[in-house]
From Swiss-Prot:
The gene is pheT. Belongs to the phenylalanyl-tRNA synthetase beta subunit family. Type 1 subfamily. Residues 398-474 form the B5 domain. One of its GO terms (cellular component) is phenylalanine-tRNA ligase complex. This is Phenylalanine--tRNA ligase beta subunit. Gene3D superfamilies: 3.30.56.10, Bira Bifunctional Protein, Domain 2, Ferrodoxin-fold anticodon-binding domain, Nucleic acid-binding proteins, Phenylalanyl-trna Synthetase, Chain B, domain 3. It is found in: Cytoplasm. It comes from Ehrlichia ruminantium (strain Welgevonden). GO terms for molecular function: ATP binding; magnesium ion binding; phenylalanine-tRNA ligase activity; tRNA binding. Binds 2 magnesium ions per tetramer. Pfam families: B3_4 (PF03483), B5 (PF03484), FDX-ACB (PF03147), tRNA_bind (PF01588), tRNA_synthFbeta (PF17759).
Length: 789
């Protein structure tokens, strides 16, 4: 939002300096992007041409003498319209031309020195769209004085207005906010005094509304679309708006002053009635910016009885009925439509205009009549004409919002020392109506132009904003003595990173067809409006997304990967607030990069088994606390996978992926994976166990048993441990063998057992007795036979 200081002063009565106003704007949340004092434009002055002679060496050049009120300058000019007595604009030596940033220097043109340049409208950046002027700019005698700066030196302020403050997209709204913050007083604009004596006829153009909104209009006949007044051109130029014609410039001025977009139609091009409706089917539209747009069902249009489209409502008008210099009869429209409808319409054709930018951020629906009357008054003043009575149609009613507001909440939330009277004044200054202000709870009605004030805490924010954020007292946050345990997820991340894995974060969506291959065809949560067809299901398992990551990495030549993700999974029974978190990991390729010291190998089930139990170990769940059962999941290898149970609850699985799944993702090597269902694991004590010093030496003994291939080896380990829990510290398998020397259907399973006592050194007899118990238990429980060396 750009405006000049003098424009602001039209509505704000204050003696405050420019620096103070800029500082206050930032303090109240209206961020100042820039302030341009236009020093670079002060070198363009109004001059009078006092002599013109032909150039002695060039037919198309003329040597001119121009007077700036102080001295005379010689300028070589090629314009065909230069003549003695005319007023034009001289760019002094050192000036920078606005159009192309050319720096003017002393030049010698065909042997004649030139001290400056006489400028055209185009070079000055003020060429009008319909202008046919050629050559240098010619100024009227009574508007400009010789020697004065052509451009106004009025400082231009540019603000970055946030989307919720559409009311400040007009200079009047900015002045109102400054006045509310104590910077001067807001000057009153009495729109009720605007009346027209010659509204004795009814508009020949009717309006019909088939969408939610309000439309008002007035027909003005017999206008003269003359040149725009100098002051208005300067205001528009300062805002970066090109002057088009007097009528168009007036409605742009109303929009920039009061945040009230309007639209003008050439009334002679409209067949009887304007109908505001949505489009039934796609249609091409030729806009007044000389571009074609393909309109769809999102667009609201204004169409006449001849089915000609005259505008995309709130966005842009048509080329056919735009207002030109020779237009005599106009229809002036002032409308309000649902901001969402305008936003959708604008985005459909990928066009944002000054009008749509404001309408989609909400404009005051109560200001239509006054805005229309003000625009009509200015058009009659500068262009003449005879207006009709105002025609109006609406199917939207703006209802006031009543907010229960406690003034004490400002002090409690904002930690400020502010009186009830000050709070009352601030609310009234921004346009609120305050009732019951003698009670503890006030009834506050926000003004119609503040769509962002919807809750009582919005009012608290408004008071604090105007009172000054710098006045909020420092209030140190109280320090609690409660010690919180480290976040479990962060702990698990550290563990898996130490395992050489890399964390990834993927979408919560996945592909339905792939999920079905994993057996997820029921209790799944489909997405009604997916981002694309490959993300049409809330993921029932993180594994699906990790496999997609592996597949994409392989396509880029990354043939070794170990990745994990901690995230949520979803099913049809999931509700808001569920925390169905899992830890999922995948390994692919070789376990180590190729190196000089070790021979790499392909990853296998034991790599992910280690990852799985590292996660459980971090949750203080030991290996001996869980049960391993051969997995029946269709997407896992039937002989190289296991489901893990804790207290008879399935808490996860690990293993090698089934070859058919590997083929589905077009992955070239076997993949091993794991998934821990964190949400199924009961709350456990995450505190670290105290360190226990081991004072006495351990003893290791190895045993090799012949057992049936059908024996659950996990059970074998557990039985061995239970024979003497006081002395047996650990039992692990270090070899499994079948083949030569072993009967068919049998396995040789080698156990390594560690013995240790916490209070003495073990003697040989104790070790022998404990070993005999192990041999006896395995012999009785599994028909195991101890192998001799």
């Amino acid at each position: 939002m750009r405006f000049t200081l003098s424009w602001l002063m039209q509505y704000l009565d204050t003696d405050a300096s420019l620096d103070f106003i800029i500082s206050k704007l930032s303090d109240i949340g209206l961020e100042v992007d820039s302030v341009d004092c236009k020093k670079h434009l002060q070198s363009f002055v109004v001059v009078e041409v006092i002599d013109v002679v032909p150039h002695h060496a060039a037919d198309k050049l003329k040597v001119c003498q121009v007077y700036d009120g102080v001295q005379t300058f010689q300028v070589v000019c090629g314009a065909s319209n230069v003549k003695v007595g005319m007023k034009s604009v001289l760019a002094y030596v050192g000036s920078v031309i606005p159009k192309n940033q050319t720096v003017i220097k002393v030049a010698k043109l065909r042997g004649v020195d030139s001290y400056g340049m006489l400028c055209s409208r185009d070079e000055l950046g003020i060429a009008e769209n319909d202008s046919t002027d050629e050559g240098i700019i010619e100024l009227s005698d009574n508007t400009y004085n010789v020697g004065e700066s052509f451009f106004s030196c009025d400082p231009v302020i540019e603000l970055n207005i946030t989307p919720n403050r559409g009311d400040c997209l007009g200079v009047y709204g900015i002045a109102r906010d400054l006045a509310a913050a104590g910077v001067g007083k807001l000057k009153s604009v009495n729109f009720c005094d605007i009346t027209f004596d010659n509204t004795c006829y009814i508009s020949p153009i009717e309006i019909c509304l088939e969408v939610q909104g309000i439309v008002k209009g007035v027909y003005i006949k017999g206008i003269r679309n003359c040149e725009t007044p100098k002051w208005l051109k300067e205001y528009l130029f300062s805002c970066g708006v090109k002057s088009i014609s007097c009528v168009v410039d007036i409605i742009n001025y109303i929009m920039l002053s009061f945040n009230r977009p309007l639209h003008i139609y050439d009334a002679d091009k409209i067949a009887g009635k304007l109908v505001f409706r949505k489009i039934d089917d796609q249609i091409e539209f030729f806009a007044l910016n000389d571009k074609k747009y393909l309109l769809g069902k999102e667009n609201i249009i204004a169409v006449d009885l001849a089915n000609r489209i005259h505008s995309i409502v709130g966005v842009i008008g048509s080329e056919y009925s735009k207002c030109l210099f020779d237009t005599e009869n106009i229809f002036l429209e002032c409308a309000w439509f649902d901001p969402v409808d305008i936003a959708l319409s604008s985005r459909k054709i990928k066009l944002s205009t000054d009008s749509s930018y404001r309408l989609e951020r909400f404009v005051d629906p109560e200001f239509l009549q006054d805005g229309l009357k003000l625009a009509t008054k200015m058009i009659l003043e500068y262009c003449g004409g005879s207006p009709s009575s105002i025609v109006s149609v609406q199917n939207y009613v703006h209802n006031d919002i009543l907010l229960n507001f406690s003034p004490d909440s400002v002090r409690n939330i904002g930690s400020v020392s502010i009186t009830r009277d000050e709070i009352f004044d601030f609310l009234c200054n921004i346009g609120c109506v305050v009732k019951n202000h003698d009670c503890d709870i006030w009834i506050v009605i926000p003004p119609s132009w503040r769509s962002d004030l919807k809750h009582s805490f919005d009012l608290v924010e408004e008071v604090l904003r105007l009172y000054g954020y710098d006045k909020i007292l420092e209030n140190p946050i109280p320090i609690s003595n409660i010690e919180f345990p480290d976040n479990l997820h962060n702990k698990l991340r550290s563990v898996l990173l130490s395992q050489g894995m890399t964390e990834v974060v993927t979408w919560s969506f996945t592909n339905l067809e792939f999920a079905k291959k994993f057996g997820y065809d029921s209790d799944i949560m489909l997405i009604d409006n997916p981002i694309n067809n490959n993300m049409n299901l809330m993921r029932p398992s993180v594994l699906l997304n990790l496999l997609q990551v592996i597949s994409e990495n392989q396509a880029y030549g990354n043939n070794d990967a170990a990745i994990f993700e901690i995230g949520q999974i979803y099913n049809i029974n999931s509700v808001c607030g569920d925390n169905n978190y899992v830890v999922s990991g995948v390994r692919y390729g070789d376990n180590l990069p190729r190196n000089f010291y070790k021979t790499d190998r392909s990853v296998d089930i034991f790599d992910v088994k280690s990852d799985f139990f590292k996660v459980l170990q971090e949750m203080n769940i030991g290996y001996d606390s869980v049960d391993l059962v051969r997995s029946t999941k269709s997407y896992l290898h039937p002989m190289k996978s296991a489901d893990v149970y804790f207290n008879n609850i399935l808490i996860g699985y690990f293993g090698e992926l089934h070859p058919s799944i590997v083929h589905l993702y077009e992955i070239k090597r076997p993949i091993v994976c794991f998934e821990v269902f964190l949400y199924k694991i009961p709350v456990v004590d995450l505190t670290r166990k105290e360190f226990v010093e081991l004072r006495y030496q351990s003893v290791k003994r190895d045993f090799a048993f012949l057992v049936s291939k059908n024996v659950n080896i996990q059970c074998l380990i557990e039985v061995a441990k239970k024979t003497n829990v006081q002395l047996i510290e650990d039992v692990s398998i270090f070899d499994i063998y079948e083949g030569n020397g072993i009967d068919k259907g049998m396995l040789s399973v080698a156990l390594s057992v560690t013995f240790r006592s916490v209070d003495h050194t073990l003697n040989d007899q104790e070790i022998k007795d404990a070993s005999d118990l192990i041999i006896s238990a395995i012999s009785k429980g599994f028909n195991g036979i101890l192998r001799s060396c």
